[in-house]
């Protein structure tokens, strides 16, 4: 009953008004799975290729009709009649047929949309929720946890048109007992932050990920206004709520220096920028820093890991791009201690699960993540629970493309109850 009988690809619109690929996989018995590929703004150079048309007369060149054509043509032909429950087999067929290292023939956006739609269709055929099916695919049936959200409440860098260099300033409601309570806490801080910003005459327009995007005097001021909002919401910073940052440092790495344009073009070496971050961790309870240096600055990352790696979580995003080959090298060299998981960086569910497993086996944490260009697709919520990853990044408390994932987590927690504990601070590397 899980034989694939029809595959449909279409061009839909993402949260930035750009096209993306949506796929449907239909099975015998009327079971259907549907999924859409997300899209990043600050991207690692070694990510799998997101195929765009390049036709400037349509969507300013960002159309995805070639990728959609791959779904409706060669991909559909190759997987029709195959068993959707064999996720690894379906993904292998598509990857082998594409025939390139970075999925540039069909596009990672095409392959991923079909991969996720196939998983959803198989879950439907098995009569189970997606998170349960993912746990089975992961070899960990029945093992779940609810992830600690990293809520991006101030957006900077490539995610906003402001003067803040560091891309994401996040809160983690580690003191909550459930994910539903964590979401409530995050919402309360988010609304108090608006009041704090308005009180200072600052803008409360939001960036790509739903966080506020004010102009600030320094990157440290972002932490200061968040600290004010946490206190105003009635929480204790460092106890109920901790802080995290995504520097996305590749975006301000120029000629071997880290240049903070928003702070008068201050330039830092790798070591100096590491100590700049170290000072921030002494002033504020920052427990996680993502991409604290450029993706190619491996010597710098080795130094940063030596300085900060036993104190806080150091997450590799552009650094590792959800790629097991790169992650393996990082583990061997002792680079960072956590990986950000974005399934469109690698382009299939099977490869994503392999990256999560490799990280966990090496004692690294895995943080499941959205992209700045999203849709209403909430698959990452099921992925986080089904792999018991423990942490999730899915933006702030506004924009339906972000909130869709939080709402799905609430539903899943309601269904699983005590089978999916919310472990709070224990999930974060160096904080147990």
Swiss-Prot record:
| Biological process, per Gene Ontology | glycolytic process
Which cofactors go with this protein? Mg(2+)
Q: Name one Pfam family in it.
A: Enolase_N
One cellular component GO annotation, for this chain's record?
Answer: phosphopyruvate hydratase complex
Record text on cofactor binding: Binds a second Mg(2+) ion via substrate during catalysis.
At the top of the EC hierarchy, this enzyme's class is: lyase
The entry lists its GO molecular-function terms as: magnesium ion binding; phosphopyruvate hydratase activity
Name the principal localization, coarsely classed: cytoplasm
Residues annotated as binding (2R)-2-phosphoglycerate: 167, 342, 371-372, 393
Positions of disulphide bridges: none
Q: SMART domains of this UniProt entry?
A: Enolase_C (SM01192), Enolase_N (SM01193)
**Quaternary state and partners of this protein?**
Component of the RNA degradosome, a multiprotein complex involved in RNA processing and mRNA degradation.
What HAMAP family does UniProt report for this protein, alphabetically? Enolase
What job does this protein perform? Catalyzes the reversible conversion of 2-phosphoglycerate (2-PG) into phosphoenolpyruvate (PEP). It is essential for the degradation of carbohydrates via glycolysis.
| Protein name in the entry | Enolase
Q: Which organism is this entry from?
A: Salmonella dublin (strain CT_02021853)
């Amino acid at each position: 009953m899980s034989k694939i009988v029809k595959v449909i690809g279409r061009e839909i619109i993402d949260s930035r008004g750009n096209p993306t690929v949506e796929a449907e996989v239909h099975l015998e018995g009327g079971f259907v799975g549907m999924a859409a590929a997300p899209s990043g703004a600050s991207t690692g150079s070694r990510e799998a290729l997101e195929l765009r048309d390049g036709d400037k007369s349509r969507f300013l060149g960002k159309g995805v009709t070639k990728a959609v054509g791959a779904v409706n043509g060669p991909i559909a032909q190759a997987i029709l009649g195959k068993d959707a429950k064999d996720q690894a087999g379906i993904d292998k067929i598509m990857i082998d047929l594409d025939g390139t290292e970075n999925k540039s023939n069909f596009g990672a956006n095409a392959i991923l949309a079909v991969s996720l739609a196939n998983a959803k269709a198989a879950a439907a055929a098995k009569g189970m929720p997606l998170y349960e099916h993912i746990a089975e695919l992961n070899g960990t049936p029945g093992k779940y946890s609810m992830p600690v959200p990293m809520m991006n409440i101030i957006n900077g860098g490539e995610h906003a048109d402001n003067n803040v260099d560091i891309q994401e300033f996040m809160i983690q409601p580690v003191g909550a007992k459930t994910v539903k309570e964590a979401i409530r806490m995050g919402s309360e801080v988010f609304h108090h932050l608006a009041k704090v910003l308005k009180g200072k005459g600052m803008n409360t327009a939001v960036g790509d990920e739903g966080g506020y995007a004010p102009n600030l005097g320094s990157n440290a001021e972002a932490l200061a206004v968040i600290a004010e909002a946490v206190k105003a919401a009635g929480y204790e910073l460092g106890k109920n709520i901790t802080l995290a940052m995504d520097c996305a440092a590749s975006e301000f790495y120029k000629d071997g220096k880290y240049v903070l344009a928003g702070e008068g073009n201050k330039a830092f070496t790798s070591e100096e920028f590491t100590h700049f971050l170290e000072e921030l961790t002494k002033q504020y309870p920052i427990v996680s820093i993502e991409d604290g240096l450029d993706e190619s600055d491996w010597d710098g990352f080795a130094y940063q890991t030596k300085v900060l790696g036993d104190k806080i979580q150091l997450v590799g995003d552009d650094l590792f791009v959800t790629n097991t080959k790169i992650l393996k090298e990082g583990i061997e060299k002792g680079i960072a201690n956590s990986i950000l998981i974005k399934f469109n960086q690698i382009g299939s569910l099977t490869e994503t699960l392999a990256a999560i497993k490799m990280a966990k086996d090496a004692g690294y944490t895995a943080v499941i993540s959205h992209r700045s260009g999203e849709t209403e697709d909430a698959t990452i919520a099921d992925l986080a629970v089904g792999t018991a990853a423990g942490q999730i990044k899915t933006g702030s408390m506004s924009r339906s493309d972000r909130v869709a994932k939080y709402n799905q987590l609430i539903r899943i927690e309601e269904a699983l109850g005590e089978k999916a504990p919310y472990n709070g601070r224990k999930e974060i590397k160096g904080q147990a």
